[in-house]
Amino acid sequence: MTQTAAPGRVQTLTKEQEKVLKQVWVHLFQFWGIDVDGSAVLTAKEPEPAAPSGKGRKLLGLFGKRKDATGAARKESNGKAAAKVYDAEKVEDSDAEKEKPTPQKVEGLEEMYELLKELDGAAVSKEFWSMLRCDYPDNLLLRFVRARKWDINKAMIMMAHSLRWRLNEGKPEDIVFGGERGAQKADKKGIVKQLELGKATVRGFDKNGCPIVYVRPRLHHAADQTEAETSEYSLLIIEQARLFLKEPCDTATILFDLSGFSMANMDYAPVKFLITCFEAHYPECLGKLFIHKAPWIFPPIWNIIKNWLDPVVAAKIAFTKTAADLEEFIPAEQIPLELGGKDEYNFDGFVMPDGSADTKLSDEKGKAAVLEEREAIIKRFIDATISWIESTSDEESAKWLEKKIDLSKELSENYSKLDPYIRSRSFYDVNGTLKV
């Protein structure tokens, strides 16, 4: 089906929403050490961030310092890459390890700076660009902004929490790039067992064209794996589901099949972890969550769980009992046969990838060529974003916004080329259901 971008995306912004997005980029560029004149978009409550002075300024940024707001000096400085995406972090000055930048704090964003004080701008910048799959940079940021109801300060703090988590705790890039074979090679038996059971499978698409994650809680027993292995398995599934997202679809549907569920399967720890992930680190990624065929023992459990949920997430949850209920949202051809649908897929048929499809993982020359192209697109995107922020008329702003969208498409297409060089082929790649 033909899809159009939903409200609050870069393709559909109102004038006020566009201003908030500009403010987000100004604050990010400030932390990355990129010069931009944000005076036209920052309000009285949000004074323009002052750039850090001296050597500290030089330590920040994905593509080096920007020497002025416009002109040749800026373009020249953009040509000097300071930290490469997916590569080891690099900085311009040899004394980088001795001195970390201390950006001037902006009123209302003190918590953000506190959260990121142990990280430098290059690390945060690198993580931002590497967490993109086929999504657009602006739309990734807008997830956090929408989740915080367009409150710039709350959105920036949420983003800071999530970036720090990705760098220091969750490390989802390591998990998804290593894939199922990564868990097997690391001898993480609990993760391997969950994969072999087919506890959660990305399969099919709903009526909006968004991927479905089919979960069978009856297969879960807490003793089969550690809590850490359950969390890592959950992150693997979430990140693999992200690979199925293609603009303008930016959410996934989760179908919890509770047939056969008993108290022996109940485990509150992973439920809490998933709630935290979706609310704090993957905002606006959940489209709909179906709890299907809940047994009579489930209401007391639900009474506990619903108190942990943010109202926005809770509003996306629906209880269903029949295939007809599901067919309001999911085509019959995409509903598992065992639930009364027409999809005859074998959900017990997981096969561990043997690595034979990972032919490009060792091709450093090919990877370098695609990364060089990616760096160039990102540099052009940053320049276009600065011109968009600094534009002095609605017409000029619209022109640069359109340019940003075009470059976002290029970046998305580039990731499709880059993916086999950095990510081990998953079960979904091998069986042909995933086409990044």
Curated annotation (Swiss-Prot):
Major localisation: cytoplasm
SMART domains reported in the protein's UniProt record: CRAL_TRIO_N, SEC14
Transmembrane parts of this sequence: none
GO molecular function: phosphatidylinositol transfer activity
Biased composition range(s): Basic and acidic residues: 86-102
Classification via CDD domains: SEC14
Gene Ontology CC terms: cytosol; endosome; lipid droplet
Pfam families recorded: CRAL_TRIO, CRAL_TRIO_N
Protein family: Belongs to the PITP family.
UniProt name for this protein: Phosphatidylinositol transfer protein CSR1
